[in-house]
Amino acid sequence: MSQTPDQRILECLENEYPSDLSIEEIAEKTGMHRNTVSKYIWGLEREGKVKISRRVGRAKMYITITE
């Protein structure tokens, strides 16, 4: 069974933890388009599964929220 975009993004961030990633980096690592990553990361942020860890210029860096 294939993973949903949400699952692919979360898995990518979990694999890189404790490092944070930009939308562009997540897109490269998952093979998804950056617009798709942006759409789904926004939803994951609203659900409290990821958060912005810092900003580098205009880019937002994301990290998973561990329990």
What are these model-predicted stretches?
Residues 43, 47:
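Alpha-helical DNA-recognition elements
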